[in-house]
Regions:
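Short intrinsically disordered, low-complexity coil segments enriched in acidic
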Residues: 1-7, 70-75
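Bacterial Sec-dependent N-terminal signal peptides
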Residues: 2, 6-7, 15-52
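Non-catalytic cap/lid and distal C-terminal segments of serine-dependent acyl enzymes
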Residues: 48-291
Length: 291
């Protein structure tokens, strides 16, 4: 879960503790309040990065790339650094799930807070994070839901990536490129990565849908394409909750990977198809990038 969730839990516990103390006399209530306050202060300190470095704060801008609405996380002083010495940054393409929009990762996913906290701790590299609306037509029916995973977005991605590289100082080196997504975005990530095998050294599938139902060219011989992708030895990271409704599909895919002796990294959490888990997964995935 996101780094400081424990703080909220302990604050809530302390508030409940104080509420139960309402029947105590005045002196005891003061003692209980001071004890709870010290407890909470300790949790704040424990949750804060143990670092004397100045905190680095990225910024998020809205953009349109190849007609696709996007949110883009930029490292601190991005424009000045590019203008001064043409600094080039690693890039992560991060995709939302069905019914989501381009700002899901910044609003519900807490991407900015997670990135800034991990940067302050020195646990991640600075990078640009491009968060596209990978489902620009909001599905409202079963047919439209099927169209959201029809191959259209995956086949469009090379042009989207090319324009992203033209607009931002991001690396074209596959070793400095990552792609990830949750649920439908995990499905898109999986199939973009084999469609463009060799273009991404880091691939993250968070609670992903797996098997395509469309006959689009992107999905032709996808199992063979995954084998070809794995020959390039990417970090292939899969995360899923034990109660996730996609758990069995992911388990089946993992068995297939193992039967074919294809290496991957697997993380299994408690819980289901939730933002608590996806915050946890992105935090773990970010720490592995561009090492």
């Amino acid at each position: 879960m996101y780094l400081c969730t424990i703080l909220g839990k302990n604050l809530l516990t302390s508030i409940i503790f104080i509420t139960f103390a309402k029947n105590l006399n005045a002196m005891n209530r003061i003692f209980v309040f001071l004890t709870a306050t010290i407890l909470c202060a300790g949790m704040v300190v424990g949750c804060s990065p143990k670092s004397n470095k100045p905190r680095r704060a990225g910024t998020v801008i809205r953009d349109t790339i190849q007609g696709t609405p996007c949110c883009v996380y930029l490292p601190q002083n991005y424009e000045a650094r590019v203008a001064k010495n043409q600094e080039v940054f690693p890039v992560l393409y991060l995709q939302h799930g069905m019914y989501g929009i381009e700002d899901d990762w910044t609003t519900q996913g807490r991407l900015v807070e997670i990135m800034d906290s991990l940067l302050h701790l020195g646990e991640v590299k600075e990078m640009v994070v491009i968060m596209p609306d990978n489902c620009p037509h909001r599905p409202t029916s079963d047919e439209e839901r099927a169209n959201a995973m029809s191959g259209e977005w995956e086949s469009h991605f090379p042009e989207f990536m090319a324009e992203s590289e033209a607009k931002y100082n991001i690396s074209k080196d596959p070793s400095l490129r990552a792609i990830a997504g949750l649920s439908m975005g995990g499905f898109h990530t999986m199939h973009i990565s084999h469609f463009l095998h060799g273009e991404f050294a880091y691939i993250g599938l968070f609670s992903p849908a797996i098997r395509p139902t469309s006959s689009h060219l992107v999905y032709d011989n996808w199992e063979n394409e995954v084998r070809t992708l794995m020959a390039t030895e990417p970090l292939y990271w899969i995360g899923i909750g034990k109660e996730d409704f996609l758990y069995d599909y992911v388990a089946e895919y993992r068995r297939w990977l193992e039967e074919n002796h294809l290496e991957y990294t697997y993380y299994e959490s408690a819980g289901g198809h939730t933002w608590d888990n996806w915050q946890d997964y992105i935090c773990r995935f970010l720490k592995k990038l561009f090492r």
